[in-house]
Amino acid sequence: MMQRLRRRAILLLALVLIGGAYTVYADQRTRTPEAALMQILHAVRTEDRQLFDTYVDEDAVLTSLHTDVSTLLVDNIDALHARHPADWFFRHDSAFMKNYMEQHRTEHLDAARTALDFYFDTQRVPVTKTDGNARWGSDEMRAFAAHYTADMEPAVIAGDRASVLCRVYGDDTDYGRLLSEGFVTAELVRRENGRWKLVRIRTDPARANGFYAFIDAAERYWELQGWD
């Protein structure tokens, strides 16, 4: 049970990166990467599923996010154990972690998709235990969203692809203090209609307040929830 809670919390923090931070950007043009991200944030804030789907390739984001997180956990398992020696999840070797993440890939992705479904449909009633877990996840997404904001650097555009460095930071509350500052990069592609669509969110262990900042936040989240 505990390992499932921890896995869900990792996914929860990842989902927060999709749209849990709100801010207002100066660029109001509709056909720029920055404007696309602003529309995503607005969709999350207003729980507008149609607008969200217009600017987010959900399958691409979630599958790439799982792949990226899996790779980061495998490649940095020794450093993670040294950083958080009390966490059983980091006491395994890279071979175990690789196999573990591969075995649970479908479960993780299904959980993330269902949590998003509940987020955008507050009238949906949980029926199964899986539904209940997803509903809990969507409620936690709202809790995070209420206490985080973001800003971003100008987009770097190469042909029909763009990357945008975003800084996410919390307020002075229990949830907000979990992550004082974290950096992620949003990747978008330009569709045939000229609009940009989010396809990937990644973070870098080499960047200050990158990957490790989110892991540290997850560890603080365990404590906040009383899971330790």
Task: List each language-model region with its residue ranges.
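Short, Lys/Arg-rich N-terminal segment immediately upstream of the first membrane anchor
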Residues: 1-5
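Alpha-helical transmembrane segments of integral membrane proteins
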Residues: 6-10
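Short, low-complexity N-terminal intrinsically disordered segments enriched in polar/charged residues
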Residues: 11-99, 103
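Alpha-helical protein-protein interaction elements
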Residues: 14-17, 92, 111, 128, ...
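Alpha-helical structural elements
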Residues: 17-20, 95, 114, 131, ...
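Residue-identity detector for threonine
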Residues: 23, 30-32, 46, 54, ...
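Surface-exposed, charged secondary-structure patches
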Residues: 74-177
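Low-complexity, intrinsically disordered terminal/linker segments enriched in charged
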Residues: 134-228
